[in-house]
């Protein structure tokens, strides 16, 4: 689940500039503004909202809520045609960030104190694998579906592909005990 979710959510770093240029004809300045808005929202969610969310809902529900926000954002971004709406939706999309710290908390609790370094090493390794797989996969999907001569022109396809991965994670997490799932 951790690897699938990380691959799915790494789409933003992998294709955001390419996608927003293709879909909305954004300038580098507009891309920078959108990334700044996301960064601020990301910091607020991680710095202010994660702890109360986990306290109120627990780790599993927080993960599920984060997955739901992430899935909804990706599907919406796939079909958007107005860049102004995308900017407005960034704060809601950033709520998907709730899942990652809750997943890491579950990972940490799944092993004893003497294995904390090992589990964090595994998580870091999976993150690194995702950062190799995602750019190759998502830029290829974007290239195929952004070719104006292709049968199907749909630059939002990488977001639908990522949404499918998040949906799979949601299905797995909602049906199993967390320690054996991650």
Please place each PLM-identified region on the residue numbering:
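Intracellular juxtamembrane helix-capping segments at the cytosolic ends
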Residues: 98-112
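Structural signature of the two symmetry-related core transmembrane helices
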Residues: 61-76
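Short amphipathic helix-loop junctions that connect adjacent transmembrane helices
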Residues: 14-31
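Helix-loop junctions at membrane interfaces in 12-TM secondary transporters
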Residues: 76-90, 99
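Multi-pass alpha-helical transporter architecture, strongest
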Residues: 160-182
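Helix-to-loop junctions at the C-terminal end of transmembrane segments
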Residues: 45-59, 142
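Loop-to-transmembrane helix entry/capping segments in MFS-fold secondary transporters
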Residues: 28-29, 111-125, 152-155
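A membrane-interface helix-boundary motif in multi-pass transporters
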Residues: 140-166
